[in-house]
Each structure stands twice: as structure tokens, then as C-alpha cells.
Amino acid sequence: MKLQYLVALLFVQAVPPVTAGYIHQYALAGSAIRQPIDQKTQREDLNKLVSDSPLLSLHRTICEIESVSNHEGAVGEMLIKYLRDHDFTVEKQIVPADRGTNSTAERFNIWAYPKGFPRPKIILTSHIDTVPPHIKYSLHAPDGDFDRAKVRIMGRGTVDAKASVAAQIIAALKHLKSNKDIPLGLLFVVSEEVGGSGMVHFSNSELNTNPPFFHTLIFGEPTDLTLVDGHKGNLRVTIHAKGVAAHSGYPWLGHSAISEILPILARMDELGDIPVETGGLPSSEKYGRTTVNIGTIKGGAADNVVPETASASISVRLAAGTPEEAEEVIRRAVNDVSGGSTNITVNFPDSMPYPPIDLDVDVEGFDISTVNYGTDIPKLEIHDEELEVKVKRYLYGPGTIFVAHGAEEGITVGDLEKAVEGYSKLIDAAVERDWPREVVVN
């Protein structure tokens, strides 16, 4: 055995098992051997990867800025500067703080369009708020052989929905670079995560004309790069029970509100599994079962006191029918269980419940899916009732909803870059679409 081969063999045997953190590869004696790099070098390599990409660097910048709902002002200001630096005309839509919050900070929707096109026909839109808490942006190399596309970006908003925001902007810039006359607009709204007041504000504004000046809306949410043909409807329910407080040693002297509400909640929990014919909530082939989630239960003062009050909040994801029909089913179910007790009160606090939302999927080259989560799509009223050709609504975006809102929220570089291609494809289809009318906006 040649001496140099023996040395190489001994070196290979001494190398520790492959772990994350090995990016560079070198050849020795015909064998590929990974050489470890220290964390500082790896961090510098990953940061350079991001800094060299307009998409990744924009995504990093907006994700590093905390923008929990009702505190979106800082990220909004950053986006306004970025868009103006790239020759967009940008308008602020000041949105008041949501009811019940203590925030006094200014926050706003962002309405942007190429100079000279204040009424764009194609609008890309997403939201700039996130759920709490803010989680710091971080980069993570893949295990095993280094693959740029598998580098993982983690932190709050990296998926929901700042990935869509960044990809939509870069896709728009790409198209405007090749054709500055493409009528593209950008709408980024606040408070999607807490009721959709940002989109409601836009919907009620003079920008939402009748008839609409736009013919295509492209909404950005995490869809795993699939084109979504619809999502379930939504209805919120609160149930309150009233009792009489007493010493727990003498419970017959009082009346337990918790005992009153428990059988009602048990019935609510199964309404999605009961056939409509026997009092259940509807299902559909497209969306499956209507689902009921009892999200919070509150009640009682102490374990040695008969509880005087109890309440529960419930989210219903509708697979079919209307919110009004679902409300009737729920009222009947509560009445059946409680025997019409006046101690029970049912409320439907959402001012804008909505049925299942069907969306457009007529662009080729995408996998198709349905989703169970809600969006602010139904919060935008489109005044196309009198039009022969209706406004197209698409829902598409990078990342998976399964990690959104969680401690492990994150997305790969590959998925983020593919999203630019996907949005570009949707823009191309919108540009090519025949729009057989001239819209006159007063």
C-alpha cells in the first residue's frame, strides 16, 4: 500500500460523522472529504447568500422588523421607502387601531403603483402584520451536502406572510423591468391576523371603485406553492352560562354555571360530525366536514365555590351553507340541550362572518388545493355584479401553514425563490387575459 494512500485512509477514518455545518468539500486520494467550518464562517457564508439576492435581502429586512398586529408602522415605513426607491408611487391608507387595543402608534395600508398608473388592472396583495410573539430572524444550513435551495430561514413572519410580500414585490419589479407599462399594483394591509380591519378599510375606501378598475387580484398566503381553489367559511360563537354562587360544601344552595354549559359544549363539539338531517352542520365534497373548535373556556372563582358564570368561545369553519344557516343550527342545538334555559346566552360576535370562498384556478402549471384557514379575501367587496366578466381572484404563496404562527415558523430559500416564478406566471396570465371593457372611474 502506497504511503500517501495509507495516510489518506487514516485521515478519512479520523474524520467525525457528517453533521450540519459542513459546506465546503475537498478531494483527497480519490475520496470526497467534508471539511468542517466554524460557525462564524458558516454564518458569514449564509449572510452573504442572502445579501447577494434582492429577494432574500428584502425578505430578511422585513422579517427583522417586528410587526405584530396593531404595531405595523415600522415595517410599513421601510416598505414605502423601498418601493419609492424602485420608482413606485406609494400612498398611505391610515388605519385606526383595532377596537380593544391600547396602541396609539400610526399604522397603515400601503397602496403602490408604477408612476402614471394610479388605477392598475392587476393587484398583488398580502398582509404585513404577524401574530405574537416576535421571533428573531435566523438562517440555518441544511444537513449533509450543502444545497442552497435547502437553506432554511426561520423567524416570525418568514412564512405568514412576509414571504408572500417579498416574492410579490420582486415578481412585480421583474415584470416592470421588462415592460414598464404593465398595469401592476401592490396592496399590503394591516390586521389580517386579528379580524381584517386593514382590508375592510381598503374595501370601504374610494380606491375600491364601482365598477372595479382592476380585473385580477392575486392574494398572498402560505399555500405550499399550490393554487388554492377555495377555503372554508368562518363563524365565531360565544356561549355564556349564568349560575348562582354558593359554598361548595352545600352545592344545592347554588347553581353551577359550569355544569350548565358542559353538556352544551359536548353537543357543539360533535355538530360537524352529525348529519344535517339530524341537526348537524353541513359538509361538502370540496371542503369536507364543517369543523368546530372550542377555543377557550372560562368559569368559576375557586374550587370551593359553586361557579356563578361560565363562558366559551368557539370557531366554526364552514364547509357549506351560509353563516346564517349555521347560526340557526347552533341555536337549535343549544336550545335542545338546555331545554330553552334562560341561563344560557348564545352570541355571534363576528361582524363579518362568511361562507366558503371559491377562488379561480384557471392558470396552468400549478398543483391545486383547498385550505381550511381563513383569509381577508372575503373582507374585500368586489363590485362586479353587473359585469359580464367577473374579477379573477387567486390565492397562492410560499411556505406551509403547518408551521405558521408556531415557534418553528420557517421557509427554505428554494420555496421563496419558486414563489417569484409562481407569481410571475399568474401576472403573465393576467396580462394576456382579454379584458373586453374600458373602465371609466369618476
Swiss-Prot record:
SUPFAM superfamilies listed in its UniProt record: Bacterial exopeptidase dimerisation domain, Zn-dependent exopeptidases
Signal sequence coordinates: 1-20
Pfam families listed in its UniProt record: M20_dimer, Peptidase_M20
Entry note: cofactor: Binds 2 Zn(2+) ions per subunit.
Cofactor(s) the protein requires to work: Zn(2+)
Active site: E192
GO cellular component: extracellular region
Top-level taxon in the UniProt lineage: Eukaryota
InterPro entries attached to this UniProt entry: Bact_exopeptidase_dim_dom (IPR036264), Peptidase_M20 (IPR002933), Peptidase_M20_dimer (IPR011650), Peptidase_M20A (IPR050072)
Keywords from the UniProt entry: Glycoprotein, Hydrolase, Metal-binding, Protease, Secreted, Signal, Zinc
Any one GO MF annotation of this record: metal ion binding
One example of a Gene Ontology biological process annotation: proteolysis
EC number: 3.4.17.-
EC category name: hydrolase
Glycosylated position list: N102, N343
Record-listed Zn(2+) 1 binding positions: D160, E193
Annotated localization: Secreted
Family named by the database record: Belongs to the peptidase M20A family.
Protein name: Probable carboxypeptidase PAAG_00768
